Amino acid sequence: MALNLRKNHPLMKIINDSLIDLPTPSNISAWWYFGYFLGICLITQIITGLLLAMHYTADTSYAFTSVAHMCRNVQFGWLIRNLHANGASLFFVCIYLHIGRGLYYGSYLNKETWNIGVILLLTLMATAFVGYVLPWGQMSFWGATVITNLFSAIPYIGQTLVEWLWGGFSVDNPTLTRFFAFHFLLPFVIVGMTLVHLTFLHETGSNNPLGIPSDCDKIPFHPYYSIKDLLGFALMLILLVTLALFNPNLLGDPENFTPANPLATPPHIKPEWYFLFAYAILRSIPNKLGGVLALAASVLVLFLIPLLHVSKQRSMTFRPLSQILFWTLVADLLILTWVGSQPVEHPFIIIGQLASLAYFTIILILFPIASALENKMLNL
């Protein structure tokens, strides 16, 4: 009998074990789409980004005009740019939903997978930040100035570190050049880390909505979930193309249509929408170092989540108190996102401070208390 190439060829065997014959729980819901979506987003971003890099000039004198030239004179350059810019937003929508899913269903108990995932999120945030600087519009320039300046809050080495990062005494040509280099490199780092993420995931297998072991009832990934994923893929594609074709500038900042000018500060400096929650936490502390620490903690707190799990159940499916807290946390993040987009004045300052306090309180204090209470109520 001839050998089955798919199962025996060294390379195809890896693909087969990851995408075709992968044993998958039979009851995973649409919330498990998002890992696949993120992979699609990453591939799309790398392809569109590569096409953009072919026409982009990483120089302060030409960056803005090279982007304009791309949109006007390159075949479908406008479409490639719109897909790349809005693809980034979609990427963050997917990763936030993916993290939310992991939080709700207790997927974070696969500690290695979760920790690599948090590092992936940090790398993605760094990639998006340096990418936002490249068009060299007003918000690009001032966003870069404000965010890189935060490193100066580090005691003793801060100022030296910032000047080293800038390559001079302000954000200028060397900064733009190195940011382009980082923006080109980091997606490939993300690809490598994604493979590590998947390797750890396939060690334990996927979690499921009930949070119980599913070894006794698994089905092959293909054809069941490969077909199911196509529906999600179609919906995601419709969303991205609709956004890119009908309202490509909806999520951008109008200030970025003005070339960078170090002598004119925009009235309200703010990052892209997907960083606003962290930006609101940063602004809610009236001390520079304190704000920077809170900003870092807002994402790094995810590393603590597996350590704070005290419930005897893995998933929140049958834990009403934790569910209430979870959806309160979601609402709190939406409030933080909204506050981050508003000017620094009353009442937004106090709302931001209360929402920031609530964010850390829910994660670090209320979740463990609710879990312990549920254990007690259920006599577990």
Swiss-Prot record:
It comes from Cyanocorax chrysops. Its cofactor is heme b. Belongs to the cytochrome b family. One of its GO terms (cellular component) is mitochondrial inner membrane. It is found in: Mitochondrion inner membrane. Pfam families: Cytochrom_B_C (PF00032), Cytochrome_B (PF00033). Heme b b566 binds at residues 98, 197. The chain crosses the membrane at residues 34-54, 78-99, 114-134, 179-199, 227-247, 289-309, 321-341, 348-368. Heme b b562 binds at residues 84, 183. PROSITE patterns: CYTB_CTER (PS51003), CYTB_NTER (PS51002). Keywords: Electron transport, Heme, Iron, Membrane, Metal-binding, Mitochondrion, Mitochondrion inner membrane, Respiratory chain, Transmembrane, Transmembrane helix, Transport, Ubiquinone. InterPro entries: Cyt_b/b6_C, Cyt_b/b6_C_sf, Cyt_b/b6_N, Cytb/b6-like_sf, Cytochrome_b, Cytochrome_b_C_euk/bac, Cytochrome_b_N_euk/bac, Di-haem_cyt_TM. A ubiquinone binds at residue 202. It is a multi-pass membrane protein. Heme 1 (or BL or b562) is low-potential and absorbs at about 562 nm, and heme 2 (or BH or b566) is high-potential and absorbs at about 566 nm. Binds 2 heme b groups non-covalently. The cytochrome bc1 complex contains 11 subunits: 3 respiratory subunits (MT-CYB, CYC1 and UQCRFS1), 2 core proteins (UQCRC1 and UQCRC2) and 6 low-molecular weight proteins (UQCRH/QCR6, UQCRB/QCR7, UQCRQ/QCR8, UQCR10/QCR9, UQCR11/QCR10 and a cleavage product of UQCRFS1). This cytochrome bc1 complex then forms a dimer. This is Cytochrome b. GO terms for molecular function: metal ion binding; ubiquinol-cytochrome-c reductase activity. The keyword Metal-binding applies. GO terms for biological process: mitochondrial electron transport, ubiquinol to cytochrome c. Component of the ubiquinol-cytochrome c reductase complex (complex III or cytochrome b-c1 complex) that is part of the mitochondrial respiratory chain. The b-c1 complex mediates electron transfer from ubiquinol to cytochrome c. Contributes to the generation of a proton gradient across the mitochondrial membrane that is then used for ATP synthesis. Its main location: mitochondrion.
